[in-house]
From Swiss-Prot:
<dbReference type="InterPro" id="IPR027387">
    <property type="entry name" value="Cytb/b6-like_sf"/>
</dbReference>
<keyword id="KW-0249">Electron transport</keyword>
<feature type="transmembrane region" description="Helical">
    <location>
        <begin position="113"/>
        <end position="133"/>
    </location>
</feature>
<protein>
    <recommendedName>
        <fullName>Cytochrome b</fullName>
    </recommendedName>
</protein>
<dbReference type="GO" id="GO:0008121">
    <property type="term" value="F:ubiquinol-cytochrome-c reductase activity"/>
</dbReference>
<feature type="binding site" description="axial binding residue">
    <location>
        <position position="82"/>
    </location>
    <ligand>
        <name>heme b b562</name>
    </ligand>
</feature>
<dbReference type="GO" id="GO:0045275">
    <property type="term" value="C:respiratory chain complex III"/>
</dbReference>
<comment type="subunit">
    <text>Fungal cytochrome b-c1 complex contains 10 subunits; 3 respiratory subunits, 2 core proteins and 5 low-molecular weight proteins. Cytochrome b-c1 complex is a homodimer.</text>
</comment>
<dbReference type="Pfam" id="PF00033">
    <property type="entry name" value="Cytochrome_B"/>
</dbReference>
<dbReference type="Pfam" id="PF00032">
    <property type="entry name" value="Cytochrom_B_C"/>
</dbReference>
<keyword id="KW-0349">Heme</keyword>
<feature type="transmembrane region" description="Helical">
    <location>
        <begin position="348"/>
        <end position="368"/>
    </location>
</feature>
<dbReference type="GO" id="GO:0046872">
    <property type="term" value="F:metal ion binding"/>
</dbReference>
<keyword id="KW-0679">Respiratory chain</keyword>
<keyword id="KW-0812">Transmembrane</keyword>
<dbReference type="InterPro" id="IPR005797">
    <property type="entry name" value="Cyt_b/b6_N"/>
</dbReference>
<keyword id="KW-0999">Mitochondrion inner membrane</keyword>
């Protein structure tokens, strides 16, 4: 134990992972941070191995992925773990964000931690999209064409930005080279931001379900929460092994098994399942520029939460209005994901528009209103007690 505190590097790890004081009442909802760190390390290691065999060329990219699966030793496992690892990463990311929303982790003094987390979320979406485009299959080719065209919504220079990103007049070899380089780089940027996220968290410590400062009742990270984290990590490893061995392509569209054909459009162009809610918001607004703005705002609105929540109490544990509207918001998010994966027919367009309106209403109307109402009820109760 002496070397853990005398060695500067081990002392740093000791302060963050062993002797770190944590609230004694945090539940398994606080395990998603360690799960995300575990998945990120796995994704980086497997991604480096896959990059050794991938060829960023429109004619050879699809064949190189097929060669990885068929000819490279355990290549089929590498691809299955990497593809399904992305899905697990987003599952844990959404649960992590949802826990932060419910328990008010964005409120002072953890605002900086929250803001860094939102930036990580945005970069993760970009990284996932870049990786989705790399196999150059039918769905990823047309997905890349559609999503990169969103840059044309930028006034005056939009078309030039699209051509700059493409490296030509369509998705081609320069595009894949750019996407491959950025997809290789971004996980390391995310890892660096994750360290910043951890440093910011360590400054004030973790929150807890009660939403109160727990400096008087803390226990060390090791062995209590370290063992608890290992339990969920083992459960995750069981889950990803099941997906990799028994259902490796369960999250993929059938068109992902076809090579890219620039002359034939798929029946329905959809992104991966974890981006469907934002795709639904994009499609719900008829105006192209407003749709792009709404899609970006649906992510960046998370940065505004510390300014929109006026509650004197952190979190929704003791807020019945907050509980009701939070779970309604979760249902709305699931509906948006369903609409994003459906064909843009009249009934789905209408449902998507209603779900989009509620999505933004939750942040800009409902949260300010019910937090102010909650404060008013607390003040009235306190004033009646004083009398």
């Amino acid at each position: 134990m002496k070397i853990l505190k005398s060695n500067p590097f081990l002392a740093l790890a000791n302060n963050y992972m062993i002797d770190a004081p944590e609230p004694s009442n945090i539940s398994y909802f606080w395990n998603f941070g360690s799960l995300l760190a575990c998945v990120l390390v796995i994704q980086i290691v497997i991604g480096i191995l896959l990059a050794c065999f991938y060829i960023p060329n429109m004619d050879l990219a699809f064949l190189s992925v097929e060669r990885i699966v068929r000819d490279v030793n355990y290549g089929f496992l590498l691809r299955a773990f990497h593809a399904n690892g992305a899905s697990f990463f987003f599952i844990f990311l959404y649960l992590h964000i949802g826990r932060g929303l419910y328990y008010g982790s964005y409120k002072y003094p953890r605002t900086m931690t929250w803001n860094i987390g939102v930036i990580i979320f945005l970069l993760t979406i970009i990284t996932a999209f870049l990786g989705y485009c790399l196999p150059a299959n039918q769905m990823s080719f047309w997905g890349a064409t559609v999503i990169t065209n969103l840059l044309s919504a930028v006034p005056f220079i939009g078309d030039d930005l699209v051509h700059l990103l493409w490296g030509g007049f369509s998705v081609s070899n320069p595009t894949l080279n750019r996407f491959f380089s950025l997809h290789y780089l971004m996980p390391f940027v995310i890892a660096a931001l994750s360290v910043m996220h951890l440093i910011a968290l360590h400054t004030n410590g973790s929150s807890n379900p009660l939403g109160v400062t727990a400096n008087m009742d803390r226990i060390p990270m090791n062995p209590y929460y370290l063992i608890k984290d290992l339990i969920t990590i083992f459960i995750f490893l069981i889950g990803i092994n099941y997906m990799a061995f028994y259902n490796p392509y369960g999250f993929m569209e059938p068109d992902c098994a076809l090579p890219a054909d620039p002359l034939k459009t798929p029946m329905s162009i959809v992104p991966e399942w974890y981006l469907l809610p934002f795709y639904a918001i994009l499609r719900a607004i008829p105006n192209f520029q407003l749709g792009v703005i709404a899609m970006l705002l649906s992510i960046l609105v998370l940065l505004l939460l510390p300014l929109l929540d006026f509650s004197a109490i952190r979190g929704n544990s003791f807020n019945p209005f907050g509980k009701f509207f939070f779970w309604t918001f979760v249902a709305d998010f699931v509906i948006l994901a369903w609409i994003g994966g459906s064909h843009p027919e009249n009934v789905f367009i209408t449902i998507g528009a209603i779900a989009t309106i509620f999505y933004f209403s939750y942040f800009f109307i409902l949260i300010p209103v019910y937090t102010i109402l909650g404060n008013t009820l607390i003040d009235l109760n306190l004033s009646s007690i004083k009398r």
